[in-house]
Amino acid sequence: KKVVNKLKLRASVGRTGNDKTGQERFLYRPTFTTNAGGFTQGIGDTGGTNGIGNGIVEGRFAAPYLAWEIEDKQNYGFDLGLFDNRIDIIFDYFRSERRDILLQRRTVPQLGGLRQDPWQNFGKVRNQGIDMSMNLNQQIGKLKLSARGTFTFTRNKILEYDELPQKYGYQAVTGTRVSENTLYIADRLYTEDDFIVSTNANGLKTYKLRSELPRPTLGGLIGPGDIKYVDVNGDGVIDSYDRVRGVGNPSTPEIIYGFGLNAEYKGFYASIFFQGAGNTSVLLGGATSEGWYPFSWGVDQSNYRTFALDRWTENNPSQDVIIPRLHKNNANN
């Protein structure tokens, strides 16, 4: 029997445009607002101010140069059938580059006199990856068996982004992946050895951070069990300059995979399917969360209760915990 019974090669190159950017249709037209703050023309005859209604000011600046976003795409792949299609393989490599992305400029100085940041076709993102699937089929008498596996990997890179030059290159968005996080890097949890400990008459302890350690400026009272962050720029202070772009993985998974099994016998059919994601990171509580607490949604239906049990305490001063020392309010650390 022939080993290869099907082979199909595919290649495509194209260009597409996108005008559905989630904004209004007439972004290129200027707007004016009539509810601007009122103004006066001096003092009236009775001694009061001589007020004259609200003014008219320009809102959005005209942008007749706006155009569609452009995306250049390439795709190369093959379909392969083996052993009378008992094994069927589909593989694709794709690459695209999206440019002239419609966005509001972030680096226009206020001296320009614009009340709103102007819109412009600016920005470029490259995306590439592979997509593949494999099907296995076998019949034993009246029993039909099949299995299917899928795998997708994609990675993007921001080639052009409207940002001011950063003091430290590790904070720049350009050159990183879309939806990556800018975060502090946790070194470990503080221990009592990191502090000068004092105990008052009531037995309560106060902690003063040792001078040789980087000084946090994030707010709150620091103590054993709190997170000790990395002083990335080495200036002896933990502040916004120690936040690093690209810590962990993007919030959008780069890997999607799945596996399934099917069985059919005399009209009865059974199927199972598994699916997973990889190369992704999740922030507990969200990127802008001010902390979390039990019954945040009215009814505690999350894993937070389980996470909270695996936390640092004086009786469990472990570095291998999910949650650091708990506070009764937002401690900013």
Features from the language model and the residues they span:
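Extracellular/periplasmic, surface-exposed regions of secreted and cell-surface proteins
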Residues: K1-I185, N332-N333
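Short edge-strand/loop segments of extracellular domains
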Residues: K6-K8, T152, Y168, N279-S281, ...
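Conserved small-residue
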Residues: E24-G37, Q120, Q139-N249, G291, ...
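Short glycine/proline-rich turn/loop motifs
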Residues: G55-E58, V237-D242, K328-N332
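Short, hydrophobic/aromatic alpha-helical segments in well-folded domains
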Residues: A62, G77, R243, I256-G258
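Active/binding-pocket-proximal capping segment
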Residues: F94-R99, V108-Q110, G276-T280, A287-G291
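Membrane-proximal N-terminal amphipathic helix
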Residues: D131, W297, N303-R305
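Glycine-rich, aromatic-lined ligand/substrate-binding cores of catalytic
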Residues: P250-G285
